[in-house]
A protein has these predicted regions:
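Exposed aromatic-hydrophobic patches
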Residues: 249-261
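Short, intrinsically disordered/low-complexity patches at protein termini
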Residues: 104-108, 116-118, 191-194, 257, ...
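Hydrophobic, helix-prone linear segments
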Residues: 1-125
Length: 346
């Protein structure tokens, strides 16, 4: 078992924060993380899917009109313009993420918004449509500096859905092409087949489902998953939906947690042809008082010799769990609910 799994404290150290309203940058990072992952893989030779190749000039005009209106709505703080150009699903996901951290939506979304890139700085590559013409992905190419990294050539992908009689932006993605020279070369040549081969450039195969609006949380919660070689589909309290794919990530729990009984259900799917070492799932109550620490209330920890099975579980958050978050707590620290018995250290 990897050292990470030997102590749940290692997980909680990643979540030690004082909860506050999410900034737009944090929101975008949370929403894009999963989308950007698969494009870092090289495509399988000859692998294509069925997509519509639309009239490129018309698709480009549509995409840039919607994107530029959306971009200006963020700069000007125009909620009406933002809603008219943003998909219903994305609006609700952003709203739930902010509300689940006791933020105020849409105020906190616009308060610290960062300026989105200008399309004039990128070269248009091409567009594909999916879902019988109700989804569209437009790919651009250009240099971009992300974080503290040096400026590098990136693919910039805009994902749209057609709803309410108009095209709306659902999300944007950046992919660093430094380690993908063949992909970069084919994008420069405006080779539309690369867009069909790489799923990161592809349109959605279905309209994203709009999640239900969550209430402000009783307790702010986070779920942490480390699932190498596996895909995990999860629902917490029947409201917060998550999907983890061969990755290590922490998500805010939509609607949070509550004192008393909570539920979690998940399905674990092995990824073909991949090694499957140990995995871990942990649910934490996040501290809202400076100096307090997270407390784990549920875990599912396995090593590589165990068969990973999902299920539906109920776990109870007691007053002692909350009290133990205070560093001055002197009582017996309550244990999290273990989905499977913990193994003794060798």
């Amino acid at each position: 078992m990897r050292a990470f799994f030997s102590s749940i404290v290692a997980i909680s150290s990643l979540l030690a924060f004082t909860a506050e309203a999410a900034t737009p940058a944090a929101i975008e990072a949370e929403l894009k993380r999963r989308a950007s992952k698969k494009t870092q893989e090289q495509p399988e030779e000859g692998a294509t899917a069925r997509f519509i190749v639309p009239d490129q000039q018309r698709a480009r005009t549509t995409a840039e009109t919607v994107y530029n209106t959306w971009r200006l709505s963020l700069i000007r703080g125009s909620e009406q313009a933002w809603r008219s150009t943003t998909s219903n699903s994305r609006q609700m996901k952003i709203r739930n993420l902010i509300v689940s951290q006791r933020g105020s939506f849409p105020r906190d979304f616009f308060r610290e918004t960062q300026e989105a890139p200008k399309l004039e700085n990128f070269a248009y590559v091409g567009a594909l449509q999916g879902c019988n013409g109700y989804t569209m992905a437009c790919t651009y190419l250009g240099k971009m500096q992300l974080g503290n990294d040096k400026a590098a050539e990136n693919a910039f992908v805009l994902e749209f859905v057609f709803e309410g009689g108009r095209w709306k932006l659902d999300q944007t993605r950046f992919f660093n092409l430094t380690k993908l020279p063949d992909v970069r070369k084919r994008l420069r040549e405006r080779d539309l087949t690369i867009l069909q081969e790489q799923d990161g450039f592809q349109p959605y195969d279905r309209i994203p489902t709009t999640p239900p609006a969550c209430n402000s949380p009783v307790l702010i919660g986070k779920v942490f998953v480390d699932c190498p070689g596996r895909c995990i589909e999860m629902a917490i309290n029947g409201i917060s939906l998550h999907e983890f794919d061969d990755e290590r990530r922490a998500d805010i729990i939509s609607g949070g947690l509550k004192r008393g009984v909570n539920t979690i259900s998940y399905k674990i799917i092995d990824r073909d042809g991949m090694e499957r070492p140990g995995m871990a799932i942990g649910i934490f109550v996040a501290p809202e008082t400076e100096g307090n620490t997270p407390v784990c209330v549920f875990d599912h920890i396995l090593d590589q010799s165990d068969k990973a099975e999902g299920g539906t579980f109920s776990f109870t958050i007691q007053n002692e769990h909350i009290a133990s978050m205070n560093p001055r707590f002197t009582g017996t620290r309550p244990q999290p609910y273990h989905a499977v018995p913990l193994k003794s250290k060798p």
